[in-house]
């Protein structure tokens, strides 16, 4: 009898797991793959070229529907798992419980949203997945002004892509120079000048106090009452491990779900 393997999350990690199992033990597992997104595995690293128009979604698909079907994987895309019942060894999803013998949690990370007034207004998005990218592309078709909060790599890629699509872009960064985790001040200065030559306005040592608007976003309030008009606000201020399922299942959790050298959780 095959081992019932349930995998939560259809990102690059779980994709590599399935590839390895197909290579080493193709008949050993009956695999069910859940993903909160309504699609399978694609290369998130390449979302920025999709935003800028250099690539399309089809170009960055890692495993398409035919690949999953050919390998006998049952796909439950667009259906997030809401609960893990460790005692009964089932996962609870929208359509009901699914039993498992082995469970792999590969939920990845979620974007961090700064806790300011107006963060939930329409027109305020994070930059994490294809839906976020498509929302930015749709906004850019209308033109207007975009404010990107965060001057790290992801934020600058968002800014460059939106500028490439014709938006007037400002970057708001809390620290003294851009990409401070990767660059020293001198290199950050050169990067800033390059972005400014592309028409992107940079605000460093700038703290977001609130996001303004009534029915949708209209601007970003910085310190000293400076307001940047905005038709679109993109938050790119980092990520946090997605651990809520593990916490709810009373697995050991620290900065992420705690595992040993064999990637086994506290419920091996």
Model-derived features with residue positions:
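Glycine-centered tight beta-turn/hairpin loop motif at sheet-sheet or coil-to-beta transitions
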Residues: 93-96, 223-225
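Residue-level detector of alpha-helix initiation sites
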Residues: 12-16, 38, 109-111, 131, ...
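Short hydrophobic core segments
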Residues: 8, 81, 98-108, 228-238
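Glycine-rich dinucleotide-binding loop and its adjacent helix/turn
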Residues: 107-165, 259
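A conserved short coil-to-beta-strand element within the FAD-binding core of flavoproteins
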Residues: 77-89, 204-216
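Rossmann-like dinucleotide-binding cores of NAD(P)H-dependent redox enzymes
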Residues: 61, 145, 155-212
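FAD-site-proximal beta/loop scaffold in flavoenzymes
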Residues: 120-143, 215-221, 227-268
